[in-house]
Amino acid sequence: MPETYHYYIKIFFYLFSDFHKQFTIKVVMPQEILADLETLDLNKSIVDIETIRTIIPHRYEMEQLSGIIKFDPEQGIIIGYKDVSQKEFWVRGHIPGRPLMPGVLMLEAAAQLCTYYYKKTTQDDRFLGFGGIDKVKFRGKVVPGDRLILIAKNRELRARRAIFDTQGVVDGKLVFEGVIIGMVV
């Protein structure tokens, strides 16, 4: 083969290898579920909606937490749920004919669970708002009729900030995961 032909092949593979490095997608496998849900009665609340309302200020369409199943500050874990109904404000428009709970509302539900943990643990009445989210992955759908189980594991708890690993589970399957950072505002 001619010398120039080898030269062009080398250039092609050099360019392709750089291109490949830039556009490689890293696939991240889902984490294990943060709590053993099989050991819990997922239909039994230890905190009902009326008690939640004494701690969490959200109301009407933004009330995203229906109950709490487990609260264990020693282990740094709280488990709650959102019963998703056909009457949710987003059902009509997200997505017509095939309603799917928006991911931002899944995160909001988890954030409200984290706020409950923070306020009960610290006895701080100040508002804990979003300081950030990180490493969020959506892995499944939530539809009307589902019970979205929410799990939050406290990673850091300070006077003005809290960090939680969070997950959402429907029918034993992980539907989202991410880190929620709360800041006193």
Task: List each model region and its residues.
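Hydrophobic beta-strand-centered segment that forms part of the acyl-chain substrate-binding groove
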Residues: V28, D36-I46, L113-I151, V175-E177, ...
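Catalytic strand-loop segment that frames the active site of acyl-thioester-processing enzymes
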Residues: Y60-M101
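N-terminal amphipathic/basic-hydrophobic helices that include classical n-h-c signal peptides
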Residues: M1-V28
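Active-site helix/loop of acyl-thioester processing domains in fatty-acid/polyketide metabolism
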Residues: I68, L100-D124
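Acidic, glycine-enriched active-site microenvironments
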Residues: G140, R158-F176
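Flexible, low-complexity linker/boundary loops enriched in proline and small hydrophobic residues
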Residues: V28-I69
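Flexible glycine-rich active-site/ligand-binding loops centered on an Asp-His dyad
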Residues: M101, G168-V185
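Residue-level recognition of beta-strand microenvironments
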Residues: F71-P73, K141, R155-L157, M183
